[in-house]
């Protein structure tokens, strides 16, 4: 982590997002109804889904903090992928309803230009949601939290959708009343895409997809640079929520005693954790190198 208080931010960030989402839902909903902007009303429904998403994220973070037990010996970290998939599903469902309503409105031709105040409201929400995105993506990346990262992208999608609403409202006011409805369709397509991406990422995590090649190379290099390590014949890694888990099988000098081999393994574990802060579960299997290979 870049800063010591990144861990503290992890506990606070979702509450800030939850509060901001509630305020934005009410703000956009009321202003959308008063100004007659169907796109802004639809955007308020998107923010309403954000409120639910923030609540799900907060719950998943609490559960993922629980220590491993007999029922879940590998811990509760993967709950964050489930949380991320729920957020993605909410976005996808909301986008589908928004798309349907907007297309029906476009087909029927029942649209009219909203008040310019809708554009003012949309611009405020763009700023708020972009700030929340930047805050959450920083905390999520530093803590390696898929749930917080998913919530951050939820806010980014809200910021982009509000920007589309703002453009649509302005175009409607200056003489293109259909633009507000078209903006709503564009918003729904964007939100749906983000939802699908979050669901895809969650599936990869739950299916134990491999960590990035760069992380594997880092772990391999750190292990090989450890004194008395002769070679590595097996290495794999996966994400478990915020943590990274490695399985490493290495060979050491065949002349080492069992106690010394254990010390080498512990040195490898410590050095990898220093280099990769989120590598909290490292399984090491040590065996002696063949005598001929060791002499070579």
Swiss-Prot record:
Q: Does the record carry Transmembrane helix as a key word?
A: yes
Q: Which domain of life is it from?
A: Bacteria
Report one GO cellular component: magnetosome membrane
Q: List the effects observed when the gene is inactivated.
A: When both copies of this protein are deleted cells have no magnetic response and no magnetosome membranes. Deletion of just amb0974 leads to an intermediate magnetic response and still makes magnetosome membranes. Deletion of genes mamH to mamV (amb0961 to amb0978) gives cells with no magnetosomes and no magnetic response.
| Role played | Plays a dual, essential role in magnetosome formation; required for magnetosome vesicle formation as well as biomineralization. Probably binds and transports iron. Requires heterodimerization with MamM for stability.
The protein's matches in InterPro entries, at most eight in alphabetical order, are given as: Cation_efflux, Cation_efflux_CTD, Cation_efflux_CTD_sf, Cation_efflux_TMD_sf, CDF_Transporter, Magnetosome_CDF_Transporter
Q: Which organism is it from?
A: Paramagnetospirillum magneticum (strain ATCC 700264 / AMB-1) (Magnetospirillum magneticum)
Keyword tags: Biomineralization, Ion transport, Iron, Iron transport, Magnetosome, Membrane, Metal-binding, Transmembrane, Transmembrane helix, Transport
- A single Gene Ontology molecular function, please? monoatomic cation transmembrane transporter activity
According to the record, the segments passing through the membrane are: 13-33, 84-104, 113-133, 165-185
Question: What note about domains is in the entry?
Answer: The C-terminal domain (CTD) is probably responsible for hetero- and homodimerization. The CTD assumes a V-shaped, dimeric metallo-chaperone-like fold and binds 1 Fe cation per subunit.
Main localization, broad class: membrane
Q: Which Pfam families does the entry link to? A: Cation_efflux (PF01545), ZT_dimer (PF16916)
Q: Subunit arrangement?
A: Forms heterodimers with MamM. Probably interacts with MamE.
**Topological relation to the membrane, as annotated:** Multi-pass membrane protein
Any other noteworthy remark?
A: This bacteria makes up to 20 cubo-octahedral magnetosomes of about 45 nm in diameter which contain membrane-bound crystals of magnetite (Fe(3)O(4)). Expression of just the minimal mamAB gene cluster (amb0961 to amb0978), including this gene, is sufficient to form a minimal magnetosome chain with small magnetite particles.
Q: Which Gene3D superfamilies is this protein grouped with?
A: Cation efflux protein transmembrane domain, Cation efflux protein, cytoplasmic domain
Q: Where is this region: Transmembrane domain (TMD)?
A: 1-214
Gene name of the record: mamB
Which residues lie within the region annotated C-terminal domain (CTD)? Answer: 215-296
Q: Which residues lie on this side of the membrane: Cytoplasmic?
A: 1-12, 105-112, 186-296
GO terms classed as biological process: iron ion transport
Outline the inducing conditions.
Locus amb0974 is part of the probable 18 gene mamAB operon.
The subcellular localization recorded is: Magnetosome membrane
Q: What name has this protein been given in UniProt?
A: Magnetosome protein MamB
Topological domains on the Lumenal side lie at 34-83, 134-164
Q: Which family does it belong to?
A: Belongs to the cation diffusion facilitator (CDF) transporter (TC 2.A.4) family.
């Amino acid at each position: 982590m870049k800063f010591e208080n990144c861990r503290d931010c992890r506990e606070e960030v979702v509450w800030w997002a939850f509060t901001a989402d509630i305020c934005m839902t009410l703000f956009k909903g009321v202003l959308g109804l008063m100004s007659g902007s169907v796109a802004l009303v639809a955007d308020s429904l998107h923010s309403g889904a954000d409120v639910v998403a923030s609540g799900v994220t907060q719950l998943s973070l609490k559960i993922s903090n629980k220590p491993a037990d007999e029922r879940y010996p590998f811990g509760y970290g993967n709950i964050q992928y489930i949380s991320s998939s729920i957020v993605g599903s909410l976005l996808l469902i909301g986008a589908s309803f928004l798309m349907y309503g907007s297309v029906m409105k476009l087909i029927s031709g029942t649209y009219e230009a909203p008040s310019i105040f809708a554009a003012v409201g949309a611009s405020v929400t763009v700023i708020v949601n972009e700030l929340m995105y930047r805050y959450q993506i920083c905390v999520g990346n530093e803590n390696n939290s898929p749930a917080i990262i998913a919530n951050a992208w939820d806010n980014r999608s809200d910021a982009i959708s509000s920007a589309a609403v703002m453009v649509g409202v302005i175009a409607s006011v200056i003489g293109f009343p259909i633009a507000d409805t078209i903006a709503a369709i564009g918003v729904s397509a964007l939100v749906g895409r983000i939802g699908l991406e979050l669901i895809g990422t969650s599936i990869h995590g739950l299916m134990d997809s491999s960590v990035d090649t760069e992380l594997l190379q880092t772990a391999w290099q750190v292990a090989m640079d450890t004194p008395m390590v002769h070679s590595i014949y097996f290495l794999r890694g996966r994400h478990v929520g915020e943590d990274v888990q490695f399985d490493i099988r290495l060979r050491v000098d065949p002349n080492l005693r069992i106690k010394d081999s254990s010390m080498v393994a512990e040195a490898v574990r410590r050095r990898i954790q220093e280099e990769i802060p989120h590598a909290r579960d490292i399984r090491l299997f040590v065996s002696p190198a063949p005598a001929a290979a060791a002499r070579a």
